[in-house]
Amino acid sequence: MSATPLYNEFPSFLKRYFPYKVQKISLNAGFTCPNRDGSKGYGGCTYCNNQTFNPDYCRTEKPIALQLEEGKRFFAHKYPEMKYLAYFQAYTNTYGELESLKRKYEEALAVDGVVGLVIGTRPDCMPDDLLRYLENLNKHTFLLVEYGIESTRDETLRRINRGHTFQVTVNAVERTDACGILTGGHVILGLPGETHRNIVAQAKDLSRLPLTTLKMHQLQLIRGTRMALEYERNPEDFHLFNVDEYVDLVVDYVEHLRPDIVLERFVSQSPKELLIAPDWGLKNYEFNHRVQKRMKELDAYQGKKYEM
């Protein structure tokens, strides 16, 4: 008899939809961001350096189909029969003219072995005409729209120059879910000014939204960002968790989350040459093992402290 899982894991979620192994391939489709080009603001979010999540095969000068083929070769040596999700990750992947967006998504879906899309975007970049198109696309392929939520506190969103309020996130998530589209969120735990109590309250706020999946990761200070300069000038404004502190925070956070939300990850690993701090020297699976060990010690599980 198998043990009850401590939390809902993303691989188990994918098994509900696919009878084979599935791997996401990150893409850089040449998008920018309304928080960089002046539409919403300039300079971007203070923590952001998109180099931190662009693999070597993922370059804007390469066509989407070529990025996917190179990504497939990167993964195929391990699982030759694997299928793939095209992950539009870098910048804001719904920011553009509708016909241009459709061409990009459909170019990805035309690649052999690609069985669906994951589209990362901002909650203030989901116009009605695009949402109608995605609603129809969702009838023919796997589709997950992943919103960068980052925080539920408007004070924090202003501080990191996010360019939208939490209510904008609420509206986007609810509109997307109402179209029958799987809807995910991404948050950063430990943004400046946020306490342990604030962060746990965030879990409660997110649990009220119709989210299917959630990614979280620790605040990382990245070279070349405005936040790195802020840290250099005022380090007292930041609390950078040590690994044990962050494990305990994640456990508390997960206990307050709605039990059915699928948890995709707890940490992120930025390239060594870009990372200022914290540097724990752990792989994702090593951190996950620490979380699972701590949850077992505390008899914790996802949703244990969840209140509707």
Q: Where are the language model's segments positioned?
A:
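Structural recognition of alpha->loop->beta junctions
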Residues: 45, 109-114, 201-216, 287-301
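Acidic (Asp/Glu)-rich catalytic clusters
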Residues: 75-77, 104-112, 132-142, 174-178
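Conserved C-terminal portion of the radical SAM core fold
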Residues: 167-227, 244-267
